[in-house]
């Protein structure tokens, strides 16, 4: 998992895909135009980071434990995206969607599991005043199970999956763009195959 040959790209390709999917869904899944990326494996290469558990991992560590991307999307949307497995911080912070008619604060969460532990907050102008209100968090213990069941049902019955393949391609094109940009030090061409 931590070796380049078998682990791929690290945190961006692992937990980054879930956070990126959440943000792209919130803005309508536009196609990427350009991506500038940065990756680092600094903490993963430090023996002291592992305490006494597995210091030998530092020598094997070959994937990024931190990645950041600045993504320009269709429709004039810009995404400032960061993800990390390891950092000297408790969180990289809340996700902020800043629109022309309002904003949305999405609390830092382990969004891979399909739910939020805290409510999201909407900010907007009403009658000339800035207001904010929380969106209630739906109570459910089985969001992840629902995702898996939906996928299995689509495969068994030949139906449409809840996540279109076009979204998976956009998500992966952005991740690939961030990793390539970090490797070459400039913006690569982003190509999203048509489905």
Positions of predicted regions on the chain:
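C-terminal helix-rich "cap/oligomerization" subdomain common to oxidoreductases
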Residues: 74, 120, 127-128, 136, ...
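A general structural signal for well-ordered alpha-helical segments in protein cores
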Residues: 19-20, 145-149, 175-176
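Phosphate/oxyanion-binding loops and surfaces in catalytic or ligand/nucleic-acid-binding neighborhoods
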Residues: 25-30, 103-104, 178-181
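A generic structural signal for residues located within well-ordered alpha-helices
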Residues: 15-18, 146, 166, 170
């Amino acid at each position: 998992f931590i070796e380049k040959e078998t682990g791929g790209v690290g945190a961006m390709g692992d937990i980054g895909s879930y956070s990126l999917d959440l943000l792209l869904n919130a803005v309508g899944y536009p196609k990427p135009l350009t991506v500038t990326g940065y990756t680092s494996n600094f903490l993963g290469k430090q023996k002291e980071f592992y305490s006494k558990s597995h210091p030998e991992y530092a020598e094997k560590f070959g994937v990024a434990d931190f990645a950041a991307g600045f993504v320009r999307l269709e429709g004039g949307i810009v995404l400032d995206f960061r993800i990390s497995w390891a950092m000297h911080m408790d969180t990289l912070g809340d996700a902020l969607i800043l629109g022309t008619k309002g904003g949305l604060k999405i609390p830092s969460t382990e969004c891979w599991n399909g739910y939020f532990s805290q409510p999201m907050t909407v900010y907007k102008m009403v009658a000339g005043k800035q207001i904010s209100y929380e969106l209630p968090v739906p109570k459910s213990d089985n969001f992840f199970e629902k995702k898996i069941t939906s996928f299995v049902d689509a495969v068994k019955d030949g139906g449409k999956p809840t996540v279109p393949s076009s979204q998976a391609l956009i998500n992966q094109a952005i991740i690939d763009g961030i990793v390539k940009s970090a490797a070459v030090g400039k913006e690569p061409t982003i190509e999203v195959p048509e489905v």
